[in-house]
Amino acid sequence: MGDCVAPKEDLIFRSKLPDIYIPKHLPLHTYCFENISKVGDKSCLINGATGETFTYSQVELLSRKVASGLNKLGIQQGDTIMLLLPNSPEYFFAFLGASYRGAISTMANPFFTSAEVIKQLKASQAKLIITQACYVDKVKDYAAEKNIQIICIDDAPQDCLHFSKLMEADESEMPEVVINSDDVVALPYSSGTTGLPKGVMLTHKGLVTSVAQQVDGDNPNLYMHSEDVMICILPLFHIYSLNAVLCCGLRAGVTILIMQKFDIVPFLELIQKYKVTIGPFVPPIVLAIAKSPVVDKYDLSSVRTVMSGAAPLGKELEDAVRAKFPNAKLGQGYGMTEAGPVLAMCLAFAKEPYEIKSGACGTVVRNAEMKIVDPETNASLPRNQRGEICIRGDQIMKGYLNDPESTRTTIDEEGWLHTGDIGFIDDDDELFIVDRLKEIIKYKGFQVAPAELEALLLTHPTISDAAVVPMIDEKAGEVPVAFVVRTNGFTTTEEEIKQFVSKQVVFYKRIFRVFFVDAIPKSPSGKILRKDLRARIASGDLPK
């Protein structure tokens, strides 16, 4: 019998902060409102546009009323509802109400085209849509065909219910719901490391764990308290905002100031008026703050925490923003929808903060494990060596909805979620992201799936082949550009192709440049060699 070789141990990294107790058995809504006895009469939500304010007790009660209203409309435990909404108080009531009902919320971008919304409606099998009147036309025909109820938060068109009907329901008529911690509560859509958008199943346990990793314990990684005012400018259909603002904000008892869309002057006015203390942002907002000359006219001294996520932030931009917020700690977090979403967070935000390095995106969150692996061999790597970032813990997704194959390629047999991002962990446990294995393009923090745009381009009668890759852009971070092979004899122009795409997709998926080539580089198995195309862009070797 040959020698027995011991398996090589994984090199696993953990947070500098000690693990904490996490009440993973609690439903998400119970967990978020667990401290309501201390904050019940305090302002919970402020509508920035109108000044309307809701206390914690009112938000909790209205959420239970919405749950009862959903029940009366026939929404059962395990059913899915779609939130097709901008940021608004109703977003909170609808999401939390669905959670109380034991239902699932799938969040869709209201700027999606009709085709994009319907694709998500079909995939998620949503039974009800909560939206605004201006978006009803996108879904009304499909909803009528499938007998899906539409509810509007403003003036309800014909055949639509008004959201007030849900808020007027009697919460005492809501039947008791027994929620399993492994039940799905949120279903955002993400392209993951490759391919088309897929439903990401986030459970009660997963979101409770993710929120606790950030804001719970004696020394929270993200220190927030009941005197804080947090601005909600990031769209709640994005998991970063849903988690870091809605869930973390409620758990920590902060006041959440809601803005529908980013506009620099109203944004600065609200920060000054309400003395905002916490700003969860993305790089395009950080860039606007750094470059806008009007910023200096406003008093931003109340802001103590500026966190940036969804895409990396450069050192120069970090320094420019620090100058605008004199009393703020600035740092980055790193997330991925499938990871719940937070993998790493800056320890400068902790109650007892640590010194951090510029350009780092934090250290791995508590109650989780991280490793860096060689993308070719899957062997774990030591500090300061670049490899694929992997995360393991209760916060990660249950899997992709109805897609076991994609789930298996993302979460391995040992429970490690493979992110498709390349990075390294330094001697001080700080994580740096340097590249991306995955195909996703990040436009202002929004995901763009190349496969989706390639499939669309190939429906054009004069295009025989196409590939979509990112190009660096100062304002957007990255923009999608297309390499296109024209069908023999056709002289289709760049502008014609750009218009063809823009009519069918949301604004951030529009093609910014089209380069005509004789062939798309591919591997022997037929896979597009995106690295070759990215290298051509980087070197400036582009067709005229």
Curated annotation (Swiss-Prot):
Keyword annotations: ATP-binding, Ligase, Magnesium, Nucleotide-binding, Phenylpropanoid metabolism
Entry binding sites for ATP: 190-194, 198, 332-333, 337, 421, 436, 527
Catalytic activity entry: (E)-4-coumarate + ATP + CoA = (E)-4-coumaroyl-CoA + AMP + diphosphate; (E)-4-coumarate + ATP + H(+) = (E)-4-coumaroyl-AMP + diphosphate; (E)-4-coumaroyl-AMP + CoA = (E)-4-coumaroyl-CoA + AMP + H(+)
EC number: 6.2.1.12
Pathway: Phytoalexin biosynthesis; 3,4',5-trihydroxystilbene biosynthesis; 3,4',5-trihydroxystilbene from trans-4-coumarate: step 1/2
Binding site for (E)-4-coumaroyl-AMP: 240, 310, 332-333, 337, 345, 438, 442
Biological processes, Gene Ontology terms: phenylpropanoid metabolic process
Induction remarks: By fungal elicitor and UV irradiation.
GO molecular function: 4-coumarate-CoA ligase activity; ATP binding
Region SBD2, residue ranges: 333-400
Cofactor: Mg(2+)
Binding site for CoA: 261, 444-445
Residues covered by region (SBD1): 263-332
Physiological role: Carboxylate--CoA ligase that may use 4-coumarate as substrate. Follows a two-step reaction mechanism, wherein the carboxylate substrate first undergoes adenylation by ATP, followed by a thioesterification in the presence of CoA to yield the final CoA thioester.
Family in the record: Belongs to the ATP-dependent AMP-binding enzyme family.
Domain notes: Both substrate-binding domains (SBD1 and SBD2) are involved in the substrate recognition, and are sufficient to confer the substrate specificity.
PANTHER family associated with the record: 4-COUMARATE--COA LIGASE 2, LONG-CHAIN-FATTY-ACID--COA LIGASE
Protein name stated in the entry: 4-coumarate--CoA ligase 1
Species whose genome carries this gene: Petroselinum crispum (Parsley)
